[in-house]
Curated annotation (Swiss-Prot):
Gene: thrS
SUPFAM superfamilies referenced in this protein's UniProt entry, alphabetically: Class II aaRS ABD-related (SSF52954), Class II aaRS and biotin synthetases (SSF55681), ThrRS/AlaRS common domain (SSF55186)
Cofactor stoichiometry and binding remark: Binds 1 zinc ion per subunit.
GO cellular component terms, A-Z: cytoplasm
Species, as recorded: Mycolicibacterium paratuberculosis (strain ATCC BAA-968 / K-10)
Official protein name in the record: Threonine--tRNA ligase
Pfam families: HGTP_anticodon (PF03129), tRNA-synt_2b (PF00587), tRNA_SAD (PF07973)
SMART domains from the UniProt entry: tRNA_SAD (SM00863)
Amino acid sequence: MTVPATDSCPAPIRVPAGTTAAAAVRDAGLPGRGAPDAVVVVRDASGTLRDLSWVPDTDAEVVPVAANTDEGRSVIRHSAAHVLAQAVQELFPQAKLGIGPPITDGFYYDFDVPEPFTPEDLDKLEKRMRQIVKEGQLFSRRVYESKEQARAELAGEPYKLELVDDKSGDPDIMEVGGDELTAYDNLNPRTRERVWGDLCRGPHIPTTRHIPAFKLTRSSAAYWRGDQNNASLQRIYGTAWESQEALDDHLRLIEEAQRRDHRKLGSELDLFSFPDEIGSGLAVFHPRGGVVRRELEEYSRRKHIEAGYEFVNTPHITKAQLFHTSGHLDWYADGMFPPMHLDAEYDDDGTVRKPGQDYYLKPMNCPMHTLIYRSRGRSYRELPLRLFEFGTVYRYEKSGVVHGLTRARGFTMDDSHIFCTREQLHGELASLLRFVLELLGDYGLTDFYLELSTKDPDKFVGSDEVWEQATTSLADVAAESGLELVPDPGGAAFYGPKISVQARDALGRSWQMSTIQVDFNFPERFELEYTASDGTRQRPVMIHRALFGSIERFFGILTEHYAGAFPAWLAPVQAVGIPVADEHVPYLESVAAQLKSYGVRVEVDASDDRMAKKIVHHTAQKVPFMLLAGDRDVAAGAVSFRFGDRTQINGVPRDSAVDAIVKWIADRENSVPSAELVKVSSGE
């Protein structure tokens, strides 16, 4: 949960040769320790972040980096991870150090310890960390003269020894990188004696007192460097901020996020579950969840038909050769389920009469859509051809990264593949992006930015020229949208660059939603052609597009965005009748029948519970419209509206109530209904 960072770009300052960056910051009158915008590091002309103790050999112009910026927070969190590691090794001397990087909104550190950490251990560690912070220990950078010196010093730290020779470029490995091998020592501020140290490339804040606010949040198991074949370590997570106020805001957001967790709400609202008997990452939707999912799909299906898409269906498994042709088995095999060897025939003595072949669960729909295109000759008059499918795919996600509906192993993509001419590409991309943004907006997501993922130089197919053309087309369309564009170097799939539409939810969290990917490679691999207007055979361009990402993921995101209180048009139960007493049930059933005639999903609660308990229950179930009826309502042919925010409208004529509910649903209002928003005339 991200508390907004300061985006202002401070003016550069000059650091004279032979003086520290800290002195230049002080002379410039910039904020120091204690202020939320205190300068914690500087960025030099090459873009490298430098400690405030850095002394340039020649005059240097640097940009101050404040604590309340993304970069400043990252430095604070990295330093907090060091303080955590120091506390762990003081309280648990047998602990061996793994890695401890800053991450979004926090930090973690991995440790090899005999027993998992307990909540009581975290309390003790946090207490010791506060003491270290209060001591004001200095972070002091030291350069190793050689790798041999580093190895000798780190002889008791096997995981650090492994990192001395690391050349992976993994951004989570803060220990090494750059031209030098360095350590950061924590020094006693009075004696300058080394208290603790760690292999690290930095940078760091000047002293531990520059960590104004932090908290340890949890611990878990984690494989060394994320590989399940490696040792299992214990990971401690924490968060650190530039002020206590920012930390408190963050913790409130975490608490709210936990309240909105779709896995929790899925159980409470009886929407979906993950039975152990089926397997990790494989969801089943219950009747109420099935209603929401159906409404999500049906509205999307209607909008796609209006936009000129043609619906197709493809099987869940296919022969291995298809994924050899597409390149998936060359580049994506680790993300696929193991093959099934089928079709072999044997003689009675076991001799193979006909060899079998491998089949795979499909991880993507695109190869099959190319076969639909290729099934007959195509003319330029048919292009653009927009194929669309709710296609279920299967990906072998590691168990440690599976997370409810938002990271599953089996899911249904709202998958489209568009085949067009090169001349049509720009217009098709522009209209496609507009379509994506409008449709997501219809579901209540309106705060967007774009991410442009470009070629991974070590993992791509096709020529540089083709990649450049595709990337330029996407960049131009992104610029025309007027939305913020964030670069993602090396983030593209192996077959083409892409634009990702990122949406911010009600808590300000960013979610990757739609992807739009240009692909010149698949048409080559599958030898796709069309007859051009001059009679020549030409290659089409292929555009991959998943608007929701997957139905399951979008379901999970919307569940959290709305905290389970889905808009009435999506809600599994749109209205419920709550009688004051049993004798009022028949009247409410007649109101319900009237609503059902308009297609409203309505129930009447005829249980033995008291009315107050029924209201509490249906409020917890997030039913948008509760209709109450007692003697006066029945006599007047009216109902009383009750809403989730506890507001109420009494004595509404039943026809007016029905009209109001039907209109609210038909208009696809995404706000939560209340006495203030629902326009009806009260009979009182």
